[in-house]
Structures are given as C-alpha cells and as structure tokens.
C-alpha cells in the first residue's frame, strides 16, 4: 500500500484541560507512535495542525480585536503546536519537516514550496503544515483541503473531540442522534450537516478527496481508523 493521507488535528486535541496543559506531551507521543505504525503500512503522512488550544481568532474578533490581527495570532498558535509535534516526533525517531504558509525566520521552520515538500515526502518525512493558509478569514479546515489537494492526498482524516463521526443531529444535545457510517458530499449539503467550513468542504468535494471523521480522543484512534477498526463516518 502506498498512499498519501492528511491528518487534520485541532489544537484542542493536543490539550489536557484537566491538567491545565495547552500541550500534553504524552498525547503527542501517543500520536507519534501511531504515525510510525502507519508509515510501516506504506502510507505517506501530512499533518495540518490548528491553534485553538492557544487562541481562537473568531472568538477574539468578537471581543474587539481586529479580525485580521486575530487570525494572524491564531496562525502563530499553529506554529507553536507544529514545533511541539516536530520535537516529540524527532525524539521518537520520526523524520519530520515543519513547513509554514507564512514567511518566518528559517531557524524556526521552512516556508512551504511544493517542489521541496514533495521531495521531503518522497524521503519519508512526515510533513507538518503550520500557519493555516497564510491568509486571514480562512480556517485550518481550508488549509487541510488546500494542502491535501496540492500534495496529492486522497484521504483526509478529520479528528474531532469526543465525537466519532457525523450525526443527523448534535449527539451532545440529542442522546438518540444517529451516526452515519457513510454519506455522500451531496447528502451532507442537502441535509445541512456540519462537517467543515463550506470553503474547505467544497474544495475537498471538487478534488474528490475522501473524508474520514473520527474521535481523536479515542485511544490509538488514528492507527485504528486506518485499519477501519473504530467507528467513524466516511464522506465520499
């Protein structure tokens, strides 16, 4: 098996609120161990990381901070998360490259150039994309579908916090909500179900990228998802 997958991680998935940790390094190590297993199955791995454990641009904008500025602060939060992933993954013996949509000091991380990124990927590096799209008013969901499209990934794993798929109603409110095992892009639109923001969702649909929605908080969920051993929703 030889395919390229992109894993969309929220910043919150790295946090441990009970321990008041913005980044729980034990959780990051668990993610890294799963990546090694996935690489051994022949997959090439891309990661897009959010920054919500540090900052949420939309919330800050509502409290009086200029939306452009708020979003750029959020992008810097993704850089912090990406560097944390990079450090832990390297300690686990995983080859990684942190690539930014924004121009930063090269001592911090590299600016994304597709040709170089493809070479790193061929050399079996896990690529960690930070900085979102590099522009305000776009979410990291949009960054995920953008990088998946550019890098030729055919699957995006969308990790949610304590929600193991797409439901016909909010499972946190309705205990009888039904989870979809599989659903088409058109059905999601017709039923007005929330998966990603509309820009990201449209890009994934147009580029025929399969989405797998799963609970990132479930133990070993990423490696289990690759083997289809946990509950999830497939959007195709």
Curated annotation (Swiss-Prot):
Biochemical pathway: Pyrimidine metabolism; CTP biosynthesis via de novo pathway; UDP from UMP (UMPK route): step 1/1
Q: Where does UMP bind?
A: 51, 71, 133-140
Q: Where in the cell is it found?
A: Cytoplasm
Name a Pfam family for this protein: AA_kinase
Q: Where does ATP bind?
A: 8-11, 52, 56, 161, 167, 170
Keywords of the record, alphabetical order, are: ATP-binding, Cytoplasm, Kinase, Nucleotide-binding, Pyrimidine biosynthesis, Transferase
Question: What does the record say about activity regulation?
Answer: Inhibited by UTP.
Q: Which InterPro entries match?
A: AceGlu_kinase-like_sf (IPR036393), Asp/Glu/Uridylate_kinase (IPR001048), Uridylate_kinase (IPR011817), Uridylate_kinase_bac (IPR015963)
Task: Identify the domain of life.
Answer: Bacteria
Q: Name one GO biological process term.
A: UDP biosynthetic process
Substrates-to-products reaction catalysed:
UMP + ATP = UDP + ADP
GO CC annotations on file: cytoplasm
One GO MF annotation is: UMP kinase activity
EC number from the UniProt entry: 2.7.4.22
Q: What class of enzyme is it?
A: transferase
The UniProt family comment states: Belongs to the UMP kinase family.
Q: What does this protein do?
A: Catalyzes the reversible phosphorylation of UMP to UDP.
Subunit details: Homohexamer.
UniProt protein name: Uridylate kinase
């Amino acid at each position: 098996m030889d395919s390229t997958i992109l894993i969309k991680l929220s910043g919150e998935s790295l946090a441990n609120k009970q321990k008041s940790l913005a980044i729980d390094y034990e959780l990051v190590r668990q993610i890294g161990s799963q990546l090694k297993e996935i690489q051994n199955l022949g997959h090439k791995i891309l990661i897009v990381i959010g920054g919500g454990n540090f900052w949420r641009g939309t919330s800050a904008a509502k409290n009086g901070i200029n939306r452009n500025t708020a979003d750029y602060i959020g992008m810097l939060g993704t850089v912090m998360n990406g560097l944390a992933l990079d450090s832990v993954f390297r300690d686990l013996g995983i080859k990684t490259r942190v690539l930014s949509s924004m121009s930063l000091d090269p001592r911090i991380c590299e600016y994304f150039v597709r040709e170089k990124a493809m070479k790193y990927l061929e050399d079996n590096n896990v690529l960690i994309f930070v900085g979102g799209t590099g522009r305000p008013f776009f979410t990291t969901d949009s960054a995920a579908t953008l990088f998946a499209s550019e890098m030729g990934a055919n699957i995006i794993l969308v990790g949610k916090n304590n929600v193991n798929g797409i439901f016909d109603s909010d499972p946190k409110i309705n205990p009888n909500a039904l989870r979809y095992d599989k659903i088409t892009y058109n059905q999601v639109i017709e039923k007005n179900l929330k998966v990603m923001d509309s820009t990201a969702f449209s890009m994934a649909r147009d580029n025929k990228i399969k989405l797998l929605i799963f609970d990132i908080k479930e133990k070993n969920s990423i490696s289990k998802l690759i083997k289809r051993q946990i509950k999830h929703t497939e959007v195709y």
